[in-house]
């Protein structure tokens, strides 16, 4: 049964009884759920892309072209993976901004797990950006990994170890693909921990009132 009284003062979803939460939660609390949808979409499309991708510097770009041109609905998978990656970051930055604005960093365990999630996501995105091994991919792999050389004493050794040689080459692409494949599963694990830690104490809300106010 829908109560049509004072409709203008009620959230659209609450009005339709579709969102079983208190009235003190606003739209800004929706981005965590959107991030989970992005994560599921990225994992699924990434799996189908990985089936057809070849982690070799001579074949990587051709394999991406093959996916978009020859694989049935490959262009859909590739575009969904690329576009929802951008959407992922849009949602996470809004999610973080909401947390900063409402002081949710006071819940330290949830906040620190979220920060770890952000860093892991950024690493995953970087490794994925390199995979097509086009001109910009090669440039990104060279420039970003070269930042490690700024570390005193250990920098050059770490960079050589990461590259698998003395320049960004085939071993670099192979390990970047392996890292890009495994990191989403770490993100899923961290997301589970993030959600469990959140539900241990509950979230804050715009009014700062008791979440069971209704």
UniProtKB/Swiss-Prot annotation:
Membrane topology: Multi-pass membrane protein
Molecular-function GO terms, alphabetical: metal ion binding; ubiquinol-cytochrome-c reductase activity
Residues holding a ubiquinone: 199
Gene3D superfamilies: Cytochrome Bc1 Complex, Chain C
Main location: mitochondrion
Record keyword Mitochondrion present: yes
Pfam families: Cytochrome_B
Sequence positions that bind heme b b562: 81, 180
Cofactor(s) needed: heme b
Keyword terms: Electron transport, Heme, Iron, Membrane, Metal-binding, Mitochondrion, Mitochondrion inner membrane, Respiratory chain, Transmembrane, Transmembrane helix, Transport, Ubiquinone
Gene Ontology terms describing biological process: mitochondrial electron transport, ubiquinol to cytochrome c
Family membership noted in the UniProt record: Belongs to the cytochrome b family.
Other facts: Heme 1 (or BL or b562) is low-potential and absorbs at about 562 nm, and heme 2 (or BH or b566) is high-potential and absorbs at about 566 nm.
Biological role stated in the UniProt entry: Component of the ubiquinol-cytochrome c reductase complex (complex III or cytochrome b-c1 complex) that is part of the mitochondrial respiratory chain. The b-c1 complex mediates electron transfer from ubiquinol to cytochrome c. Contributes to the generation of a proton gradient across the mitochondrial membrane that is then used for ATP synthesis.
Protein name in the entry: Cytochrome b
């Amino acid at each position: 049964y829908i109560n049509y009284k004072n409709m203008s003062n009620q959230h659209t979803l609450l009005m339709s009884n579709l969102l079983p939460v208190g009235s003190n939660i606003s739209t800004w609390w929706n981005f965590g759920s959107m991030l989970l949808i992005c994560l599921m979409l990225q994992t699924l499309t990434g799996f189908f892309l990985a089936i057809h991708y070849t982690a070799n510097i001579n074949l990587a770009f051709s394999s991406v072209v093959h996916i978009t041109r020859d694989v049935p609905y490959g262009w859909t998978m590739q575009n969904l993976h690329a576009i929802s990656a951008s959407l992922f970051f849009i949602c996470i930055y809004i999610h973080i901004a909401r947390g900063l604005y409402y002081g949710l960093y006071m819940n330290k365990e949830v906040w620190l797990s979220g920060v770890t999630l952000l860093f892991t996501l950024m690493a995953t995105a970087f490794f994925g950006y390199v995979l097509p091994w086009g001109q910009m991919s090669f440039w990104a792999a060279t420039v970003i990994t070269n930042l490690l050389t700024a570390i005193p004493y250990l920098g050059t050794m770490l960079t050589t170890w990461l590259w698998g040689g003395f320049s960004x080459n085939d071993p670099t692409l192979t390990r970047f693909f392996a890292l890009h494949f495994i990191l989403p599963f770490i993100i899923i694990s961290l997301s589970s921990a993030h959600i469990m830690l959140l539900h241990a104490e509950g979230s804050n809300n715009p009014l700062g009132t008791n979440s069971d106010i209704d």
